[in-house]
Amino acid sequence: MAKNKTIEERYQKKSQIEHILLRPDTYIGSVEMHTQLLWVWNKEKNRMVQKNITYVPGLYKIFDEIIVNAADVKAREKEKSENPMTCIKIEINKENKRISVYNDGEGIPVDIHKEMNIYVPHMIFGELLTSDNYDDAEDRITGGRNGFGAKLTNIFSKEFIVQCGDSSRKKEFKMTWSDNMSKFSEPHIKNYNGKDYVKVTFKPDLNKFGMTEMDDDIESLLFKRVYDLAGTCSVRVYLNGQRLAVKDFKSYVDLYLKDNSNDNKNNKGQNDNNNNNNNNNDENANQNNDNLDVSLSNEPADGTPTKNNNNNNNNNDEDEIVKIHEKQHRWEIVVSKSDGSQFQQVSFVNSICTTKGGSHVNYIVEQLLSSLSKKANAKNKGGMEIKSGHIRNHLWVFVNCLIVNPTFDSQTKETLTTKPVKFGSKCILSDKTINNVLKSPILSNILLWAQAKAQVELKKKMKAGSSKARERIIGIPKLEDANDAGSKYSQECTLILTEGDSAKTSCLAGLSIVGRDKYGVFPLKGKLLNVRDASFKQLMDNKEIQNIFRIMGLDITDKNKDDIKGLRYGSLMIMTDQDYDGSHIKGLLINMIHKFWPSLLKHKGFLSEFVTPIVKVQKGSQEYSFFTIAEYEQWKENTNLLGWKIKYYKGLGTSTDREFKQYFSDIKNHKIMFLWTGDRDGDSIDMAFSKKRIEDRKLWLQNFILGSYVDHKEKDLSYYDFVNKELIYYSRYDTERSIPNIMDGWKPGQRKVLYGCFKRNLRNECKVAQLVGYIAEHSAYHHHGESSLQQTIINMAQTFVGSNNINFLEPCGQFGSRKEGGKDASAARYIFTKLASSTRSIFNEYDDPILKYLNEEGQKIEPQYYIPVIPTILVNGCEGIGTGYSSFIPNYNYKDIIDNIKRYINKEPLIPMVPWYKDFKGRIESNGKTGYETIGIINKIDNDTLEITELPIKKWTQDYKEFLEELLTDEKHQLILDYIDNSSHEDICFTIKMDPAKLQKAEEEGLEKVFKLKSTLTTTNMTLFDPNLKLQRYSTELDILKEFCYQRLKAYENRKSYLISKLEKEKRIISNKTKFILAIVNNELIVNKKKKKVLVEELYRKGYDPYKDINKIKKEEIFEQELLDAADNPEDNEEIIAGITVKDYDYLLSMPIFSLTLEKVEDLLTQLKEKERELEILRNITVETMWLKDIEKVEEAIEFQRNVELSNREESNKFKVARKQGPSSMKKKKKKKKLSSDEESEGGDTSDSSEFLVNTLNIKKNTNKKTTTSSNNVNNSKKRLRKADDLNSNELDNTLSVSKTFDDNNNLTDNTPLINRLNDENNEFSSNNVDNKSTNKNSRKKKPKIADSTNDNNSELNSSIQINDNVNDDINITISPNKTINVNEFSSIKNKLLELGI
């Protein structure tokens, strides 16, 4: 501060005008030249362009104040105004440095203000702090606010002229100011008969802005503001006498979007394409007057994304014009895409151009960000997180709005600061707009950017270290680095990747032979990631792949690397188990190298595999090793396995250290080099692992030929052969475990469960966790752990709606409900199961011998498929996804299926079936060609209450409850007021409260649609393995049924043939035994004091059949274990004559001595006669009759199982009712019968007759007279099961409890003879046999009794049958003390008893 200034000089007071001129930046912004990137009008291109211009913000502001005043006239205009505003005319004369702005509409009163005593135009244009915007109680949507406005333009002008026409007062006003509003003329008033208008003409004082003339930059900026008015004011706008071809905001936006994609390229140094046809396109763009539209082209918006067909541009995403428009009260929005570098916005508040945006722009953008963020991250699942800032950079938003009493950050009004709650209106973007944005290239651009960004980040993460870091690797657990890795000898080093830690240990044992200098070992944790289509997140989080890159010295940024120079290891060796999973691991590693460094695969010697035997066989000094199961199977088919010792090597861990040392000592013969033979190698790798080539993989699997395998005698293996001869076995296996077979409807895991249950004869309850161990042991299940098998068992026992129509296992415990779709099942260690009562009727045990059983590691396991009586694939449906294939088949009603089977047998047309789900109360309706819709039940109780009593199939109660909670808490679209959930684990009951108006609207739209009570059952993807194990897609359910019926009849032919040969075998054995005994009795054959060899030779010469000739019934497959057992007894298997051994006559020579009697001969002759009669019956029966008899038994068994289920449910419901009635009702318990000591030791409560029936297949009549309807149904089923043609069921008034059967000697025994397979004179085949060997000593069931006919005082007489079998084969059956049936013909009644399951 200067010391010589006086106080008066230091402290001054300025007038308002002096202050404005002295400090202009406070009022109009800077008056200095600024260079800034702005949108301006390009006269040559006739559109907006963004470029750097040099201008003075203050000059721009004084022009803006005048044109905003003109726009305010339109904003203040009332509906049906007498003087509507129609146009704004602006003249900008750069040469004369003069600007004028004219507008019509409601004018300024040409009258004297009584307080100011001057004319009103004079006051508002020539007096500071005057305005009509000071009443804050009034809601105004104008641009003016503070009372400066046009006065600032006046102050910064050399000349300022105002002209006004007042039609109501018939006067015209004109007044001129000059020299920065310091001088003014007297108002000039004259009479006027025209319409209202206001015209302001001014000459800016360019000296105040450091300018001498108006240059092109300021002109282009002012022209742009004129176009702004045309787009935001909805009036005609003229510039220098020419009307602007902009009619509305949409056409205004076109001035930015058209060809600006090319401008963005220009900014990056690329060429620009001109397009001067905007005016015509603007006219077209206004043809659609809808409030909401979306366009991706220059064509009229029709809501459908289209490509820009401009011939000057390529039709690619970069050239697409996105224009998504929505118009609401006081708001108009257009959403487009930016170039991704930064967020762009063009916005207006009350016609003011807010160049920096503000709260109104954020208000709109935040709505877009919320939806885009959710969708983008969902589509980019597994990739890098896409944040709101990233998404914002891809948006270009145009906003034109009217805000009540807006506030800005400064007088320059570049940024709106009004809070959204004070906007005076709301603009919630519609769902249609949001959806159109999500479908537009905006989202795809965001995802592309995210992927590009991810690649950059990934390269940083995966980039190999420095050369020094490559010499020694530290910090990688379990790596056994080669001593020479990273050194000058690194090209000679090999990294061995092993499948697991145990394989690594075995490998190290082998390395003790060849040394550690040139070999490193790194164990893989399991299967590598499929990097072909892996996400960013997957790659970034996969430490194992990163470690492999580091160990090898591979750099992900060097995709063209084609040699091994610079690597820490010159080659890579894969050491995995020789099974399907091992092949998959090899494929994944090959896929990884091919994805990142395809050229390395062409380098011979870079990639190899170490192979170990999967099977070894030895016989004496002979030893063979097999490297694939297929190779072993081929050898086995052409070899007599007698005497061979066979050892299976499940994994690398099976080999001993000694064997691994042996392998490495001969490493050349255990090493196969992968070889690149051409482009087909790369194509086959891509086909096997690319998600985009699903159809190619389908064709690949369809052309699969069983028996083609890699020849391990060859030391080179092409990648093409690896994929097509080894990897395909894994893909085939993956599909087999996911897609069921048409014959039994089972996947391998389910088939193993059924096989284990049948083998264990699971009649009594068994804990699921224990059953899993048994099944794994007896079916060679070792692929996916116990948890997977446990879930399979649980699924097979589930009974809730949407699960099984027929459950083949009993759910003894909590096996899940429709509450959570079975996910609420208890742990396997808490629940029990057993075979359901209908299972053995459907999977008839007499089909077991004709099935083709699989063999794994010499162990007989489950069959290729079972052959049920009815097609269970249609009964319970299926769902699965495998390699290249998926399948879905809905459930169907077993009654409809059986009816169609009968039509098939009778050669009648089949009737199409509609899907059916047990206990489902809703509707199932066809939706056309794709399938069916399942529809729940919703009823209107009153005008504000709804009740939902059924949900669609596969829509679970808990999920639906969460859906209702969303409807309740959704602030934007709250549909319901409240809901009450009274659903149980079985039944659905939701009571919903709604606003009556919303309920009525929902009814109009459709309650089932609004409340999502529909689900789809597709019938277009019925893919199954056919009987020949080929994948087949079936068009309809009837195609499946026809295929099944054809194969089922063939199976009955096989069953019949088997039983005939079985009877013939037994007949031949009886005949040989009879001949043998008679020979000994008649001294025709002397067996004592003879060697076995001599005796066998004599038997053969005398025509006795060796057992191997009799045993033609035995299946062709001879299981290896039998041969191994035979190898342990060489004496018995020594060939005596013509291939005959001692064992071939054991069936004769091992007969007990007391059998060598004439009585036995008579007995055998009787048996022989019976066998001949049985054979005659069997040969005469047709396979169709056999099937119909089986179907009858199946129907009865299913009905019985269903009635038991309903009875149990009814009992449960009784408990629920009793609980509601109070404690007193619960005290009424049925008095239990006092148990005997024997019964107590067996846990002998026998009150649950239905459970007793299910477990033992014995029949017991319910004597409780107060039986409910469901109980009667159960009893009716029991009666049907025990009914015999010649026994009146009314005579069976007492309990019938029988567990014994007759053997061929007419003795009561536990052994079931073949005749038990023939139910009646028509040779009906039974499906309800009882295997009494399964009776458990720890069973809690009461032992059934056979009454002693000699005990007249038997206390159990009223609860049992007395059977008296005399020497004349007469059988007396005592039903009650006074009722006895005598039957002379043994075989007839015997068959009748057997029909009862005895």
Swiss-Prot record:
Its cofactor is Mg(2+); Mn(2+); Ca(2+). It comes from Plasmodium falciparum (isolate K1 / Thailand). It is found in: Nucleus. Mg(2+) 2 binds at D577, D579. The gene is TOP2. Residues 1012-1021 are annotated as: Interaction with DNA. Residues 493-608 form the Toprim domain. The lineage of its organism: Eukaryota, Sar, Alveolata, Apicomplexa, Aconoidasida. Residues 260-317, 1214-1250, 1262-1361 are annotated as: Disordered. ATP binds at residues 69, 103, 131-133, 144-151, 411-413. GO terms for molecular function: ATP binding; DNA binding; DNA topoisomerase type II (double strand cut, ATP-hydrolyzing) activity; metal ion binding. GO terms for cellular component: nucleus. This is DNA topoisomerase 2. The active site is at Y830. Keywords: ATP-binding, DNA-binding, Isomerase, Magnesium, Metal-binding, Nucleotide-binding, Nucleus, Topoisomerase. Eukaryotic topoisomerase I and II can relax both negative and positive supercoils, whereas prokaryotic enzymes relax only negative supercoils.
